[in-house]
Amino acid sequence: GQEVNGSTWALAMMNMFLHGFDNAVIRWGDTLRNPKLKVDDKLMKFDTVVANPPFSLDKWGAEEAISDSYNRFWRGIPPKSKGDWAFISHMLEVADDNEGRVGVIIPHGVLFRGGSEGRIRQYILENEHLLEAVIGLPANLFYGTGIPAAIAIFRKGRTSQNVLFIDASREFENGKNQNKLRPQDIEHVVSVYQKFVDSKFAPGVVEEKYAFVATPDDIRGNDFNLNIPRYVDTYEEEAEIDISAVQKEIEQLEAELAEVQVKMKEYLKQLGY
């Protein structure tokens, strides 16, 4: 792997050592400006590529990307103030060309923003069909940010062009500082995803208010917008209000208020007011 933050890099190295991975190769450096995992000056290829890059990184190196010697940004140059698709582009280029898989944590804006990001997203969806799944996560799950995030999964060499959408944002355990996914929440996501990979789902609703399999026509009909609520119905009906019960509660509160006011007047009278 590669990590630009020195402290994080040192922690990662220590973590690998403590878990017995003495031969782990983790380089210290800027992945976008100076990728270091190379063989004969060519980017190394990997079966699986995973990352939790900084959300919408500003000044990520758009100017240098124009003349990138590894041609990682051939689909387009993302905005200089939002590096999300730059990281995704790098990850796709270092994934094995035959069966490489990419899993990346992203802010939801990556799924629907327009401009150059929208064009990159459309190209991948319309011409490469690499996107396999989008999984919406609960809010306040990651240290340092309370905004909800999602996982985007890409796969090289896939035969299906359908995309699985999962809204897992409501299945979690509340924490004091951060929310967390329980084992059953993770199992739910994995189970649905694995069945999709095994071609056990037809297009359409897989599980009410949780999962949907979208066809290329579905996605095209949404102008290549991948916002999860466009596919998974997240609408929750409001509970019916019992007007008579509410009226009785109001009358009871008014009676209690009148009683308190009478007592206050008596107390004030005793105090000479």
What residue ranges belong to the model's regions?
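Conserved SAM-binding loop
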Residues: 1
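S-adenosyl-L-methionine
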Residues: 4-43
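A conserved structural/catalytic subdomain of Rossmann-like adenosyl-cofactor enzymes
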Residues: 43-273
